[in-house]
Amino acid sequence: MASLLLLVLAAAVTAQLNIVPSTHPEVCVLYADDHQADANKFNGNFTQIFHSYNSITLSFMSYSSSSYDVIDIISKYDLSSCNILAIDVFNASMDFNVFLQSTNNCSKYNANKVHHVKLPRGEEWFSYSKNLKFCPLSDSLIGMYCDTQLSDTYFEISTGGTYEVTDIPEFTQMGYTFHSSEEFYLCHRISSEAWLNYHLFYRDYDVSGVISKQVNWGNVWSGFKTFAQVLYKILDLFFNSKRNVEPRA
């Protein structure tokens, strides 16, 4: 009888060790650090309201307002856990949409060096760079109307002080040499499907030019100048989406 009681107790203890993964939804806000003081005001009692009442986690993540390198910004965080993500876009030239509306493999290259890269035909490649030049190579590895040893003879891909996204035509078998005075990225577009439920909140936004053609207007908002505006709007979008899919009682 004693041994039977011991087995029952052991079974009860074992049952308590079962680990059930958390299914609490997570609402994320990625913001420029000039909003840090405002974000701190909400990171406390306000976040606890939603955690205790709705079992929702509010996660605040910041990036430097002096950095326009979107790849570096989004690679610092695991955004895959976000059920919905709000991004405070500090400057309209920042191409968050390019890297969130599609899946890309990007490689980073050092500045002030010549890089020889082959870009296979039939694939989509683009550069994310500033002050980048390239020289296409012939089948005999000779620069076509450019000298691979002299970067001043290269053809310009991007100019200016902010990062630009530029599609690269894949027309040579032997590839290209690239040179830039700044670090740059070459990216292979794997798919054109968004991998995250995200919304872009522009502080100021001019609906013109190349950027306007790249944006999915269903998730773009303009004139959101404060952290509070972004936070309340993303919460409103989150709860509205839940009401749209959940049956009424």
UniProtKB/Swiss-Prot annotation:
Transmembrane segments: none annotated. Keywords: Calcium, Capsid protein, Disulfide bond, Glycoprotein, Host endoplasmic reticulum, Host-virus interaction, Metal-binding, Outer capsid protein, Signal, T=13 icosahedral capsid protein, Virion. It comes from the Viruses. InterPro entries: Rotavirus_VP7, VP7. Its main location: virion. Residues 1-15 form the signal peptide. It is found in: Virion; Host endoplasmic reticulum lumen. GO terms for molecular function: metal ion binding. GO terms for cellular component: host cell endoplasmic reticulum lumen; membrane; T=13 icosahedral viral capsid; viral outer capsid. Belongs to the rotavirus VP7 family. Homotrimer; disulfide-linked. 2 Ca(2+) ions bound at each subunit interface in the trimer hold the trimer together. Interacts with the intermediate capsid protein VP6. Interacts with the outer capsid protein VP5*. Calcium-binding protein that interacts with rotavirus cell receptors once the initial attachment by VP4 has been achieved. Rotavirus attachment and entry into the host cell probably involves multiple sequential contacts between the outer capsid proteins VP4 and VP7, and the cell receptors. Following entry into the host cell, low intracellular or intravesicular Ca(2+) concentration probably causes the calcium-stabilized VP7 trimers to dissociate from the virion. This step is probably necessary for the membrane-disrupting entry step and the release of VP4, which is locked onto the virion by VP7. This is Outer capsid glycoprotein VP7. The lineage of its organism: Viruses, Riboviria, Orthornavirae, Duplornaviricota, Resentoviricetes.
